[in-house]
Amino acid sequence: MGQQPAKSMDVRRIEGGELLLNQLAGRMIPKGTVTWSGKFPTIDHLLDHVQTMEEVNTLQQQGAWPAGAGRRLGLTNPAPQEPPQPQWTPEEDQKAREAFRRYQEERPPETTTIPPTSPTPWKLQPGDDPLLENKSLLETHPLYQNPEPAVPVIKTPPLRKKKMAGTFGGILAGLIGLLVGFFLLIKILEILRRLDWWWISLSSPKGKMQCAFQDTGAQISPHYAGFCPWGCPGFLWTYLRLFIIFLLILLVAAGLLYLTDNMSIILGKLQWESVSALFSSISSLLPSDQKSLVALMFGLLLIWMTSSSATQTLVTLTQLATLSALFYKN
């Protein structure tokens, strides 16, 4: 009772080989604590694995594996049985040769085939395919077309947000421009009046500087020529003289511009070495930056407008020398 049949020698050899492989494989499996990363074995595990594999290779080279014991590690049998080689008798070999010869004779002859020609390239014209007319599959397919909304949507253009800083800056710039223009207009009229007074003083004696039109019966107070109020007949003549003086100034400015274009020719003919040396020395002292030149001329203009007659004469001479040197430099 309870007796099991005796195991054969082959079964015992297989079981013994499996026990040996289990012991060897147990040494290759890391046991105990692992490293801080939790992924790699320690150096002791690696050394055990190397030693175990050396023993396994030694046993395999010696052919010490029992039959069927290599399936645990996937190792092949070190001494596999060679497959039986087919043995052909001369009669069987002759029969095979005869059968192959008959097959070659009975085989139908090959028909001459035409080599395949390369297909002609297919080129689409713009009118052949709707995809080439700036459309896509999604646009042409009815399922992907945008359906019309049930409620009409009114699209309004986006309103641009105006920045208060930009608006205030534009208004401030406009006010400053008007103020500067009004100031320059007043100063230009003042300059023209002074030139007109100088002209009158040259052509009239000092005792007769009063307006000649104030004795024509107009109800106006006594005044000097060139300062006629509204209602005096000399008012229009005064502004006519101012306009003539303004035209003369423009003519002088145009002449200076013409001289700047032909300065080298004129200086070459007149041989003004001293003048050219003076202009070159002044131009060497001038700044090269245009903004600095504008600031210099504007500063001289402000000094001229807010100073006395003697200082204005000096500033005027300085301005003329600076402009002449600047024209000579250019």
Swiss-Prot record:
Q: Where is this site: Cleavage?
A: 240-241
Give positions of region: Disordered. 68-123
Give glycosylation sites per the record.
262
**What stretches pass through the bilayer?**
166-186, 239-259, 293-313
Which BP terms does GO give this entry?
Answer: membrane fusion involved in viral entry into host cell; symbiont entry into host cell; virion attachment to host cell
Instruction: Tell me which UniProt keywords the record has, alphabetically.
Output: Fusion of virus membrane with host membrane, Glycoprotein, Host-virus interaction, Lipoprotein, Membrane, Myristate, Phosphoprotein, Transmembrane, Transmembrane helix, Viral attachment to host cell, Viral envelope protein, Viral penetration into host cytoplasm, Virion, Virus entry into host cell
Look up the signal peptide feature and give its range.
Answer: none
One GO cellular component, as annotated: viral envelope
Question: What is the annotated role of this protein in its UniProt record?
Answer: The large envelope protein exists in two topological conformations, one which is termed 'external' or Le-HBsAg and the other 'internal' or Li-HBsAg. In its external conformation the protein attaches the virus to cell receptors and thereby initiating infection. This interaction determines the species specificity and liver tropism. The large envelope protein probably also assumes fusion between virion and host membranes. In its internal conformation the protein plays a role in virion morphogenesis and mediates the contact with the nucleocapsid like a matrix protein.
User: What does the record note on quaternary structure?
Assistant: Large internal envelope protein interacts with capsid protein.
Record note on domains: The large envelope protein is synthesized with the pre-S region at the cytosolic side of the endoplasmic reticulum and, hence will be within the virion after budding. Therefore the pre-S region is not N-glycosylated. Later a post-translational translocation of N-terminal pre-S and TM1 domains occur in about 50% of proteins at the virion surface. These molecules change their topology by an unknown mechanism, resulting in exposure of pre-S region at virion surface.
- What is the protein's name according to its record? Large envelope protein
Instruction: Name the source organism.
Output: Duck hepatitis B virus (isolate white Shanghai duck S31) (DHBV)
